[in-house]
Amino acid sequence: MDIYDTQTLGVVVFGGFMVVSAIGIFLVSTFSMKETSYEEALANQRKEMAKTHHQKVEKKKKEKTVEKKGKTKKKEEKPNGKIPDHDPAPNVTVLLREPVRAPAVAVAPTPVQPPIIVAPVATVPAMPQEKLASSPKDKKKKEKKVAKVEPAVSSVVNSIQVLTSKAAILETAPKEVPMVVVPPVGAKGNTPATGTTQGKKAEGTQNQSKKAEGAPNQGRKAEGTPNQGKKTEGTPNQGKKAEGTPNQGKKAEGTPNQGKKAEGAQNQGKKVDTTPNQGKKVEGAPTQGRKAEGAQNQAKKVEGAQNQGKKAEGAQNQGKKGEGAQNQGKKAEGAQNQGKKAEGAQNQGKKAEGAQNQGKKAEGAQNQGKKAEGAQNQGKKAEGAQNQGKKVEGAQNQGKKAEGAQNQGKKAEGAQNQGKKAEGAQNQGKKAEGAQNQGKKAEGAQNQGKKAEGAQNQGKKAEGAQNQGKKVEGAQNQGKKAEGAQNQGKKAEGAQNQGKKAEGAQNQGQKGEGAQNQGKKTEGAQGKKAERSPNQGKKGEGAPIQGKKADSVANQGTKVEGITNQGKKAEGSPSEGKKAEGSPNQGKKADAAANQGKKTESASVQGRNTDVAQSPEAPKQEAPAKKKSGSKKKGEPGPPDADGPLYLPYKTLVSTVGSMVFNEGEAQRLIEILSEKAGIIQDTWHKATQKGDPVAILKRQLEEKEKLLATEQEDAAVAKSKLRELNKEMAAEKAKAAAGEAKVKKQLVAREQEITAVQARMQASYREHVKEVQQLQGKIRTLQEQLENGPNTQLARLQQENSILRDALNQATSQVESKQNAELAKLRQELSKVSKELVEKSEAVRQDEQQRKALEAKAAAFEKQVLQLQASHRESEEALQKRLDEVSRELCHTQSSHASLRADAEKAQEQQQQMAELHSKLQSSEAEVRSKCEELSGLHGQLQEARAENSQLTERIRSIEALLEAGQARDAQDVQASQAEADQQQTRLKELESQVSGLEKEAIELREAVEQQKVKNNDLREKNWKAMEALATAEQACKEKLLSLTQAKEESEKQLCLIEAQTMEALLALLPELSVLAQQNYTEWLQDLKEKGPTLLKHPPAPAEPSSDLASKLREAEETQSTLQAECDQYRSILAETEGMLRDLQKSVEEEEQVWRAKVGAAEEELQKSRVTVKHLEEIVEKLKGELESSDQVREHTSHLEAELEKHMAAASAECQNYAKEVAGLRQLLLESQSQLDAAKSEAQKQSDELALVRQQLSEMKSHVEDGDIAGAPASSPEAPPAEQDPVQLKTQLEWTEAILEDEQTQRQKLTAEFEEAQTSACRLQEELEKLRTAGPLESSETEEASQLKERLEKEKKLTSDLGRAATRLQELLKTTQEQLAREKDTVKKLQEQLEKAEDGSSSKEGTSV
C-alpha cells in the first residue's frame, strides 16, 4: 500500500476522524473527565498527519534535487582536519590539479596598463600559514631563504570548477595576476635536479594527459569524476602545481618564486640548491630569469621594453596570457592547461624536470608564455646571446617581438596575447580544446620560442649564441632543462611525452608519434634541440618536421619563416592565436590534422610565407632558415602525374605524324578527330534513314526502354506519394494522441483538484465535529456540576438528551462516510476509464508506427528497383553507343563509294519535292473548289428560305389588312371620327412594311455572313490544330521545367528552414545575449548578428565559444561559400538560357496576339455597325409599338419580328463577347504564367543564395557539435548541465523543423497541382485563340497561310528542342542538388547520432557522480 497515494491518505484521514469521533462519544457517554487525554490524542493525530505531509514534500524535493546533488556532490578527504575558511584574495586564480597539496600564496605585482575584462575566476581560501610574496626587487634579499609550510588538507576547494572547458579569455591587454601556489606536502629540503621535482609531479603515473589515458583529452581526464583540476576532488590541482608554486616565469618572482616553489621544499629555482634553481638559474650567474642581468636578461628582454618573461610585465606576460581568464597555461583548463602540459608527466615547464620545467609551462597555470616567467620564458631562450626575445637586442626582444605589438604575451595586443590566442575562445592551451595545447602547439612543431624562430628552432634559437639548451651554459641552460636528466624533448621524461598529452586524443606531441616527443626533439641534440634537423620542428628526425607534420607543406618551425620573431609571428595577422588568421587559427592548430604545423593547412604554412628568412631582427639565423626551407622542399610534392595530357607544339606534332605509319583504322580515327576539331559535320552520315537502318532500330528500342523506365519511375513516385500521405496521417494521429494525452492529463489534474477539495471538505467537517464535541464536553461539565448539586430528575433528563445527541452524532458520521465512499468510488472509476483510453491510444500509435515502417521498407524496395532499372538502362545505352560507333565506322568506309549516288539522290529528292509541292497545290485548289461549291449550295438554300419567309410575311400583312378592314366594318359608327387616323395608320403601316422588308433583307445578309464566317472558322480550326499541337508540346516542356524548378525550390526551402532554425538555436545557445533578436526575420537577424558580432567577440560572456575555432570555421565557410557561389553562377547561366527561350516564346505569342487583335478589332467594328443598325431597328420597332397599341394583331406580328431579330442579334453579340472574353482570359493567363516564371526564377536564385548560407551554417553546426562533444564531457560540476542540455535542445529543434518541413511540402504539392490546372486551362484558351484567328476574315490565299504556318511550326520545333536541352541540363543539376541534399541529410543524421551519444555520456556521468 502506497502511503503517499491520495486515496489511501483520504481513507486514513477519514478513519482517524471516525476513531476520534468514537472516542469523543465514549467520553461523553461515560462522563469521564479525561479531557487532557482526548486533547493529547487529537494532537498526536495532527502530528502524524503533519509528518506524513512533511515526508511527502521532502521526498519530492529530494527527487528534484537528486540530479543536482549527484553532479555537485563530492566526497571530501580531510586527513589533517578542516581548513578554516578565509575571505579569498580578489585576484587569486585557482587551478585544481594535484592530489594533497598545502596552499601557499605568492602574489606578484599587478600593474595594469590598458583596461582589462576578466572572466569570472574561482578563488581559493588562503591558509593561515601562507605568506605574501615580496616584490621582484626583494629577490636578492630572499634568494636563499626557504619557507617551511605546515602540511594542509587536500580539500581546499570541494567542487569549484575554475574554468569550464569553454572558458573565455577576455583580456584586451595582458596583465600579471597573483597566483595561489601550494607546495607539496612533505616536500623535502633539497630535491635533486634529477630527482622527483615538482614537475615530475606524477612522473611514474604517466603525464597528466595520460592521467586518464583512454579518457582522451586531458580536460576529460577523469570524465565522470571531477576534472583534473579537481584531480582528487579538491586536492589542489596539479595546475596549482603545488597550488600556485609561482610558475617558473615567476620563478623568482618575489621570493616565493619557483625557488619557493615548494616553499618548505626548497624552491624549484634552488631546485638543487647546488644547481642554482632555474628560477634564479644561477642567481649570481645571472639567473635564467635575469638571464644576463647586465646583458638585459631575457626576463628584462629590453628591460624597459617589457622582457619576454614579463612580456609586458604590466601587460601580463604570455603566461598570464589570459589573465583572470586563466593564462595560456590554463590554456584549456578543462583540457588542462599547457603548463600542465604533461603535468604528472613532467610538463613542458618541467621541461627540465629536475631543472624545473620551462616555466612550468603554466606553472600556476602560467602558460608557455610565462614559460619561465622569472626564468624568463622560452623567449629568453638564448639569454646572454641576446635571447630570442632580444633576437636582435636593438631590434626588440622576442617579448617585444613586435614592439608596438608588445611581447609575445601581447602577441597582437589588440588580438589578445597568445594566451588569448583564441580570444574568448579558449586560450592557446585549449587551442585544439585540450586536443593540442600550445605546449603541444607544435610539440616538435617548434615550441613557442621557436614559434617563429625566424626560421631557427628554439634549440638553435641563437644557434651560435648559446641555444636554449645552452641557455646560460654555466647556469644550467634551459636546453639542458633537465640537466641531462630530461631534455625538454623528453619533456615527459619517458612518462609519455607532452605529446602523449591526451594519449587517446592524439596529442600534438604524438603528432609525429614515431618521431618521439618534443623533448626527444632530436634526442641527442639536447642543447641544440634539433641540431641535425636543424629545426625543433623536425621533432622526429626521421619524421618530417612537425610543421610538415604530415602536411608535407611546411613545419611550424618555419611558421613565419621570414617573419622571425614570435611576436611578429604574423605581424599583420596579428596574435599568434590568430597565427594565420586567414587560415585555421592556432586554436584549431591543425584542426583536422591536429598539428600546429598545419596551422595554415590549406593556405600552406605561415612559415612558407617567405621562404627566405627576411627578418632584420635575426640576421644570424638566416643560414638555419635556409636549411629548414631545404628540408621543406624535400617533403614537397613532386611534379604532376605523368598520366596527364601531353601538350606538343604544332611543328613537332606535324613532323611526328608525317614520320609515322598508320593502318586504316588509325587513319580513320585521326580523320574523325580532325573533323571534330575543325567543326566539320558530315550531313550525309545522318541521312541514312532507309528502312534497314540499324541505328533507327536501336533508337526505337532505346525509346521503348525509356518508356518502361518512365512507367516504373511513375510507380515509384506513386509509392512515394502514398508514403507521404501515410506520414501525414501518422502526424495527424500523433497530434490527436498528444491532444488526447493532454486532455487526460487535464482530467487527471481536475480529478486531483477534486480529491484535494474533498479532503478539504473532510477536514472542515472534521473540525466542525471537533467543535461539536467540545461543545458537548462543555455541556457535560455543566451537567456534571448540576448532577453534583441537583436532583435525580435532572440527571434522567440529561441522560435522555445525551442519548439523543449520541444518535444524531452517529447518523451524521454515517452519512458523511457514505458520501465520501461514493465520491471515492466515482473517482476510481473515472481514473480506470482514463487509463484504459490512454492504453488504447498508445496501442493505436504503435500500430501506426509499424505500418509506417513497413511502408518505408516498401519504398526502399521500390527505390532499389528503380536503381536496378537505371543500371540496366545505362548498360543498354552503352551497348547502343557501341553499336552506333560501329555503324558510324561502316558509314565512313562506305562514304567514298556513295559519293556519286548522293548527287543523283539529291536531284531525285528535289524532283520529288517539286512534285509534292505541285500535288499539294492541286489538292489545295481542289479543296478550295469544293468549299466554294458548298458555299454556293448553302447560299441557294438560304435564298429559298428567304423567299419562303418573304411570302409568309406578305401573307401575314394581307391577313392584318383583312382584319383591319373587318375592324373598320365593325366600327362603322366610329369611322367618321377615326377615318383620318386610319389613313395615317395605313400610311405608317406601309412605311413599316417597307422597313420590315429592308430589315429582312439585312437579316438575310447577316445570316449569310455569319454562315460564311462559320465555314471559314471550321477550315481554320482544322488548319490550326496542328499548330496547337506543336504549341502544346512546347507548353509541356515548359511545365516540366517549372515542375523541376518547383521541386528544387521545395527541397532548398526545406533545407533552408531546417538550417535557419538550427543555426539560430545554436547561435542563441552560444550567445544568449542575442535571444531578444531571435524574434526578427532570419536575414535581419543575421545583419544584426554581423553588426553586433565584433562587440560580442570582443566582450563575450564567461562561457563563450573559442574565437579561434569560430574564425577557422568562418574561413572554411568562406571556402564553401566560394564553391557554392560557383554553383550559383552555373544555375544562373542555366536560368538565363531558359529565360531567353521563354522570351522567344513570349515574343511569338505577342506577335500572334497583335495579329489577332487586329482581326478582333475588325470584328468588333463590324459588331458595332450591326449594333447601330439593331438600335435603329429597335427604335423603329418601338415607334411601331406605340402606333399599333390599338391593334393586338399588329403587336403580335411586331413582337414576333422583334423576337427573331433579337435572337439573331443576341447570337451574334454573344459570339463576339465570347471571343472578347476568351482573348482577355488568354492575356491574363499569359501574364500569370509569366509572373509565375519570374517568381520561380527569383526563388531559384534565392534558394541558391540560401543554400550557400545553409551549408555554411551546417559546417558551423558540425564543428560546434564536435566541440560540444569534446569540451562538454569534463564539465561534471554544477555549471556543466546547461552545456549537456545543448544536444537535447538541438535534437528537439531538429524534430520540430522536420515536422514543419513536412507541412510545407504538402502545401507545395497543392500549389504545384493548382499550377498544373492553370496550365491546362491556358492550353485550352490558346486553342480557342487559334480558333479566333481563323474567325477573322482571311481573304489571302491559303498557300500563304500554309507557308506562314510552316514557318511558325519550324520556329516552335526549334524552341521545343532548345527547351528539351535546357530541361535535360536542369534535370542533371537537380540530380546533383539532390545528391548534395542527401549528403547533408546524412550529416544531419550523424549529428543526431553524436547528440544521442553525448546524451548517453551525460546520463552515465550523472550516474557515476551520484
From Swiss-Prot:
Keyword field: Acetylation, Endoplasmic reticulum, Isopeptide bond, Membrane, Phosphoprotein, Protein transport, Repeat, Translocation, Transmembrane, Transmembrane helix, Transport, Ubl conjugation
The species this protein was found in: Homo sapiens (Human)
Segments for region (Disordered): 44-90, 129-152, 173-648, 895-925, 1093-1122, 1260-1287, 1330-1362, 1378-1410
Residue(s) carrying Phosphoserine: 159, 165, 533, 573, 583, 615, 900, 959, 978, 1276-1277
Keyword Disulfide bond: no
Residues in cross-link Glycyl lysine isopeptide (Lys-Gly) (interchain with G-Cter in SUMO2): 148
Entry-linked InterPro entries: Rib_rcpt_KP, RRBP1
GO term, biological process aspect, one: protein transport
Compositional bias per record (Polar residues), positions renumbered to this chain: 191-209, 225-238, 265-278, 295-519, 553-567, 602-612
Name of the protein this chain belongs to: Ribosome-binding protein 1
Region 41 X 10 AA approximate tandem repeats of [TN]-Q-[GSA]-[KRQT]-K-[ATGSV]-[ED]-[GTAS]-[ATIS]-[PQTAS], annotated ranges: 197-604
Sequence repeats: 197-206, 207-216, 217-226, 227-236, 237-246, 247-256, 257-266, 267-276, 277-286, 287-296, 297-306, 307-316, 317-326, 327-336, 337-346, 347-356, 357-366, 367-376, 377-386, 387-396, 397-406, 407-416, 417-426, 427-436, 437-446, 447-456, 457-466, 467-476, 477-486, 487-496, 497-506, 507-516, 517-526, 527-534, 535-544, 545-554, 555-564, 565-574, 575-584, 585-594, 595-604
GO MF, any single term: RNA binding
Stretches with biased composition (Basic and acidic residues): 64-88, 520-532, 568-581, 1347-1360, 1381-1403
Cross-link (Glycyl lysine isopeptide (Lys-Gly) (interchain with G-Cter in SUMO1)): 620
Positions carrying Phosphothreonine: 225, 235, 245, 255
Location(s) in or outside the cell: Endoplasmic reticulum membrane
Membrane-topology annotation of the record: Single-pass type III membrane protein
Transmembrane residue ranges: 8-28
Stated role: Acts as a ribosome receptor and mediates interaction between the ribosome and the endoplasmic reticulum membrane.
